[in-house]
């Protein structure tokens, strides 16, 4: 499915979330910088420059997601007036806030999961699930109760955001 159909035309930046509270504009949503869309404008180019420069204000080797979480309000409420929207985890699913609805999801992200080997294991299950789902006829998809395989290996390592 094309994820871009679900990104607001009015957003300067749309970003996936680890936790989505139902309000796409609420800054208390937990952003995940593993998937984001930025409309190319002078303001968004400047936002990306400031995001990169802001890393120097944080501990050495701070992750870009940690930096973004701390400064996102500066972009929205500051001089840049960035229109930031958070993507619904029902469409942009991930292991943090797992929905399992194959008939709606556009992307699947192994967020909150530690260690590459566990991510790869559970993402391989996602690919196998998608192949099974994609092979069904439309009537079979409508009546199917197929869901994503629970990310069991990742669940054992979950780093759940506060």
Question: How would you label these PLM feature ranges?
Answer:
Residues 1-31, 35-38, 45:
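GT-A fold catalytic core of metal-dependent nucleotide-sugar glycosyltransferases
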Residues 38-162:
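Catalytic core and acceptor-binding pocket of nucleotide-sugar-dependent glycosyltransferases
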